[in-house]
């Protein structure tokens, strides 16, 4: 049974409640020096790649939101002699305070680093144990308070506001004991999370192998095969053909609307951007946007239209639109393919989830100086094509098989959510003194 402290008192802070009688309340500004870092322009990054006599430079993307760890080997380094960049000392915490990752991404720093301007450094004062402050910032109640103070279009919390958030401060020996215990417990939980993630990766790889086998070899393993003539597709059933995407669509591939969306409004078309798409679903957990009828004219999606991302980190990502999503228009960084009636759109979409499609993308990237796939390249993409009835049978088979695999993945993801919640509850109980080490 977990130990508790001998006596408690009301700390006067509603979101913390009762605390051990010996503990003190204070504000974040009483525990740490807070300051943000410095940005590096994209065109300047080539000047910051020499790691000799330099410290790592940490950007928001270098912090893992699950494991709360920093990647020190991202390829960017600041020379020790460069006085233009602020420094986070060892035993400090970096936390994102602006944008979509605000309050979510944080990491304890075990070495001297420089860091981006969206990150705030919490450098502990003398008599404050840095790892304890890190865990306090990781507690769910602190995260709730942080989120309640987010303001502005970009969404963030400024440093003066952060400084005045309440904090708890036990004795330095108690801080160290709590941090050491949480290191052990959170490490154990992180190992369990990692195991679940490995199993998810294996299931995802299996799912892709099932898809690839079906869309390139068919469902009958006994049919005669022939060479497709395309290296990354390989052998295909004798009765199949290979065709370019441009020959199986209505009209031409179409770029989306080059418009700025407005806040989503019922009755107007939803504006689908690449950030709206996750796991072939339209996300509901982001701020949706709309276009006016005039802006959306000519860009309204029809049932089973396929969208392709043409640039950026998600280049090559695909999505099949379903009527159930309501009226939608698509954005300019997406390309639409309207599959003709001689072919099955679901089969074509499944091909874009195959390892053959991934290999095609890699070949395109090798030929290009930047990762960009325009309509000209997509239009020439080779696709193995069985007769329509067989396309439909394969799509139905994959609907069932991938649904089964997705159900197994969902179970693993639910387990990860439970483990994360358990981790947060343990952190809360010990950094607020509800339990004693």
What would you call each of these model-derived segments?
Residues 41-49, 148-150, 224-228, 258-266, ...:
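Short coil/turn segments at secondary-structure boundaries
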Residues 8-11, 113-120, 151-176, 327-335, ...:
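A short glycine-rich beta-alpha junction/loop motif
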Residues 11-12, 29-47, 60-90, 110, ...:
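Sequence-specific dsDNA recognition surfaces
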